[in-house]
Amino acid sequence: DFRGLIARPAVNEGDAVKAGAPLFHDKTFEQIKFTSPVSGIVVNVNRGERRTITEVIVRRDGDAVEQLQVADPAGGRDAVLATLLESGLFPFLVQRPLARLADPGVTPRDIFVAAMDTAPLAPATELLLQGREEHFAVGVRALGALTSGSVHVASAPGTELPDLSATANAVVHRFEGPHPADKGGRLAP
């Protein structure tokens, strides 16, 4: 799922982990952590060719959560970047071209957010955001702190998006068409 990743384990079999605790990190960018989605015991660290980590299996045994400091987007790029790296959310930022892990040391010119899904039978964006509108707006504001340019939010025509006026550098674009109209290559200039 993460092109260019060379994983280095942060846990061993038998270790107890909390949800949000690091399981492994990237060899190239050691500050990029991949965290556990659940609390439990590490049952297996499976390896593939050339001893690369293919999966880390955690048997769930509770609801313990790693406590993280959440940065306010107004705190600037460094505060937001530190939160994304510590929480394990940074790996979901993709660097173009080639859809590789983003380099945390590089300030992106622009950031593109696909707030739409053109895949067959995909749910409507409004349903996914229902009750989470404020979280989406704060997320866009946080992404705005990471870039020196704009945060381009792409959505389908007629889609109700949360108010993004608090993010000065957010720009909403409307796209339509057959799948894959929502993919990054189509969004970027």
Describe the function of each predicted region:
Residues D1-G4, H25, I32-S36:
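Short beta-strand-turn/beta-hairpin segments enriched in glycine/proline and small hydrophobics
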Residues I6, F29-Q31, L129:
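Alpha-helix N-cap/helix-initiation motif
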Residues I6-A16:
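Short histidine-centered loop motifs in beta-beta connectors
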Residues R8-A10, F24, K33, I57, ...:
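Structured core elements
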Residues G14-I32, N46, T54-R60:
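Short hydrophobic beta/alpha edge segments that flank linear recognition/processing sites
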Residues D15-A19, V38, E134-R141:
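Short alpha-helical basic/polar micro-motif
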Residues I32-V43, G48-R50:
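Structured functional modules or segments
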Residues N46-P189:
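Buried, small/hydrophobic-residue-enriched core segments of structured protein domains
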